[in-house]
Amino acid sequence: MRAWQDHVSGAAALARMRGPGQFRTKAGVRMFLMLCHTVLISCIQSGLPMPQTLIDLRREIPAEHQSGGPAWLVAEPIYRALQVRYDIKTGKLAILDEIVEALSSADERLASIFSELPESWKYHHVQMTQPDARVLGETCHVYPGLIESTTWNVARGIRILLAETMIEQLCLAVGEGDLYTLSDCHRRSLAKSITLLDMLGRAIIASVPQHLGVVSIRDVQNFGGEGHAVAVPAKKQICRAPSPPLTHEARARSRSEPTARTTGCLPLFDPTRSKAQNDKAERFMSLAGANHTIIWPLYVVGMSSACTPETRQYAIERLQVIHKETALEQARVVAGLLQGKVAPPTLSTELLDELPAVEMGTLPTMV
């Protein structure tokens, strides 16, 4: 934890010394925003809030240097989400009703930005005409550009962490008891969070093929992109990193690992704050320095309690491909972290069967 705090404090101090004067040029603004991104990932992994110094400085960026649109607007809700998680972690938020309200509000602020997107920011559903190992399943999403895809995935990653925290807190309230010890409202929140967690993870995975060059927006335009569903052939595969053989322990863990999709089980604790991670904080600093936009989203999905063994293996293989093609050490390190993930404790399927059904009207059509 000390490594994280030193990293965040040092970055904030550097930005404070430069002051608003760094915003006189586009280059200065760009460097500051890159710093904010690095600190953001560090804060996410360490459970720290975004330094107020950086938040205040960002608000002083002149309007002519602000990008505007969802990519700009999403930052403040993300910072708020980090603060909520920190307040829960430190006990500032300790009453269950207040915790649920704060987490729900933070998620809704993020969701509202994406519910009112212009058409130019929405992704297309693409059906592959032939199997491709770089696509999990038969469909993927194609975005107008990298900025759109990255913005969607950053928001999804934060929403996954909020959902994990919601599940953790509600499960801790249940303990060894019955789910009916929760109020109807809280049981609905639990059911919605479990469903949303799966939807968000699937959406991130569906964005991966475009990041790896399997499909592009040109394919959508060339194959009749006016509609939402488009069938396109996959591009020639450049290379594929072979998956290392699973150890006996890994095979056993894979066979026994519960999944939200097939068993309905869920974790009692947020897997992104495991003890093993705190013991290897220096390795997680790789995430803060990752300059390939899909590495952190793949990490979040792979560590999610809703991630199936199949999806986690897909994430590991894609990270290995990124490492092989780009030599980015961060991709190799994160792949190793996912390979070493231990399944969290879970609730029984019987308890989950008592959860109310999630009304589709309460879920967004696009996440």
What is the predicted function of each stretch?
Residues 2-215:
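Central/C-terminal regulatory/activation regions of fungal transcription factors
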Residues 119-367:
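Fungal-biased detection of long, low-complexity, Ser/Thr-
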